[in-house]
């Protein structure tokens, strides 16, 4: 796991990480806001809408103040696999930015578009193995495509 951004925000840090995903067979990015003294605190996962990345929510929403004040960690994954070898489509509703948080069942999407497993298994395992947040106080919410996730 590689830290690619870190910014002080209220009483905590906004970070962005890149890691090699076994589920999506490519590098993935996610954002993490963690308040200071963040042991055994609740974790919320935010799922962004279509065409977004992990950057949209962390740059536009202002959630960091609330999360800091209420001692809540917030994880924001990218919405799909990305990269040179990732299948894409001209229609914005398919391909990069449009993973729909589902596992693909057909080619050419099958190898990389396994976002359900990424969101429900791999990413929570990464967070649990690297941070001492609560394992029992976990929630998920989203907007647009992410609201159906």
Regions found by a protein language model. Give the residues of each.
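Non-catalytic cap/lid and distal C-terminal segments of serine-dependent acyl enzymes
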Residues: 1-149
């Amino acid at each position: 796991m590689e830290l690619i951004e870190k910014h002080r925000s209220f009483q905590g840090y906004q970070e962005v990480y890149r890691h090699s995903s076994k589920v999506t067979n490519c590098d993935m990015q996610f954002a993490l806001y963690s308040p200071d003294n963040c042991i055994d605190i609740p974790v919320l996962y935010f799922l962004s809408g279509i065409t977004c990345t992990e950057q949209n929510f962390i740059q536009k929403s202002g959630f960091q103040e609330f999360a800091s004040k209420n001692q809540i960690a917030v994880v924001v994954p990218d919405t799909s696999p990305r990269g040179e070898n990732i299948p894409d489509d001209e229609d914005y509703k398919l391909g990069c930015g449009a993973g729909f948080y589902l596992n693909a069942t057909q080619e050419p999407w099958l190898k990389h578009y396994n976002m359900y497993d990424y969101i429900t298994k791999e990413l929570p395992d990464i967070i649990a193995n690297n941070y001492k947040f609560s394992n029992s106080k976990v929630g998920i919410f989203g907007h647009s495509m992410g609201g159906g996730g």
